[in-house]
Amino acid sequence: MNINVAELLNGNYILLLFVVLALGLCLGKLRLGSIQLGNSIGVLVVSLLLGQQHFSINTDALNLGFMLFIFCVGVEAGPNFFSIFFRDGKNYLMLALVMVGSALVIALGLGKLFGWDIGLTAGMLAGSMTSTPVLVGAGDTLRHSGMESRQLSLALDNLSLGYALTYLIGLVSLIVGARYLPKLQHQDLQTSAQQIARERGLDTDANRKVYLPVIRAYRVGPELVAWTDGKNLRELGIYRQTGCYIERIRRNGILANPDGDAVLQMGDEIALVGYPDAHARLDPSFRNGKEVFDRDLLDMRIVTEEVVVKNHNAVGKCLAQLKLTDHGCFLNRVIRSQIEMPIDDNVVLNKGDVLQVSGDARRVKTIADRIGFISIHSQVTDLLAFCAFFVIGLMIGMITFQFSTFSFGMGNAAGLLFAGIMLGFMRANHPTFGYIPQGALSMVKEFGLMVFMAGVGLSAGSGINNGLGAIGGQMLIAGLIVSLVPVVICFLFGAYVLRMNRALLFGAMMGARTCAPAMEIISDTARSNIPALGYAGTYAIANVLLTLAGTIIVMVCPGLG
């Protein structure tokens, strides 16, 4: 039996789509030195090559892909989006505006200089900034721009062509810039990280190991009684001195949970909870030969929960003000916008931050109720909320504003982005509403993006040879300029106008570019995870601004060139 592969693929859109995705994802795993191509560019390259062979796909698949992607971007940004606007994140907001705004202006100027149409210009902006949200926003606005069919088709083809030609330029140039730009300014990143660590009492270790607390039981001997000197547990402040706290006491065969007025006596058996290194640091005379095994005394359920910050008595407060250890709980991690933050007593908590807390189940539940709520450990997505807000986003995108003879609408991209932000924000405030496991959200977002990239590549592939020969050199120059010049402008603005600490500034710059590989280089250079504070500060708002930039560039200059 003979199988005509070309006819088989052209006759089955679903098969073609998944062949492109499979081949593209394989290609995306290839590395050029230390740089991995990535899924987006892999799928785009494969789809462009197959597009040259006149394979095509139903445009409905492309539309659904970009809608899912942009909606999920909004959901991820939602918990921290408003806190960046309305509280102490004005520096991060201004940095993101400078980065995106300068890139937008430079791209428009270069597009005018080289005589490109709006499709090439917007695609070059998206690729140089390694930002798929720009591509998505521009593509959606073009489709709703009222262009005649042939002109629209050319603009969309050029959009994906510009993106494909400049994506690697933008990625490589930013990674190289992240490696060498810190060396061109007079403040060493490692010194800057240590400086802010001293000022704020931060943990600078980028590779800090996380241990769970353990429970051990000891019999109180004369050495420990002498050390307490008749003081009660409250006066001793035993956790501050040892890193452990007393969970239970057995005295005369009676098991009890001690209060602050309890005084240790000879022969008491105590259950100490603390990290392994805290147990190891205990005075040997307190523990050597005195450890006991008592099933009831040691019968404590240590749990680790992810606590979402929500309540007003925690939002805006420093970690130190929560006094977790006074409540018998241990902090393992602080997560903001999927970025792990330094464990720092002076880190100010935002609504939607996630604290990984360990301790006795009852104590963790108590502290969680005071801070916010325990994140649901479920693999079940609230599809009702997901679909309802998706519909709301589409309806918002249909709104059109009319001014005399000029009209414009938000479009699906802006509508879905706004609806996603609202869903993410409400999820951060209501633990049982709109729950989407992070794995499920990431999968839908990635799948939507890959479908979108496959669609634009197949649509644009037929014209890539002509375009590459005519504008390849110009695209190389423009891509480098748009990738690096806004970074330099952002650095000058942050360093000399905002006067930011350099470690935080470089982290914030990488967040404004939403580039995780470059962020890793900055952290390695600083030998610290301090830059993650800046990265998390700009990342959420930058994703939103980049989507709007794709819309704005088309609305401002629809006939560029």
UniProtKB/Swiss-Prot annotation:
Gene3D superfamilies for the chain: Regulator of K+ conductance, C-terminal domain
TM helices/strands, residue ranges: 8-28, 32-52, 66-86, 94-114, 158-178, 383-403, 406-426, 451-471, 475-495, 503-523, 540-560
Membrane topology per record: Multi-pass membrane protein
Protein's GO biological process: potassium ion transport
Domain RCK C-terminal positions: 200-288, 292-373
Record's GO cellular component terms: plasma membrane
A single MF term (Gene Ontology): monoatomic cation transmembrane transporter activity
Domain of life: Bacteria
One protein family per Pfam: TrkA_C
Coiled coil region boundaries: none
Protein name as it appears in the record: Putative transport protein YbjL
Organism: Shigella dysenteriae serotype 1 (strain Sd197)
High-level lineage: Bacteria, Pseudomonadati, Pseudomonadota, Gammaproteobacteria, Enterobacterales
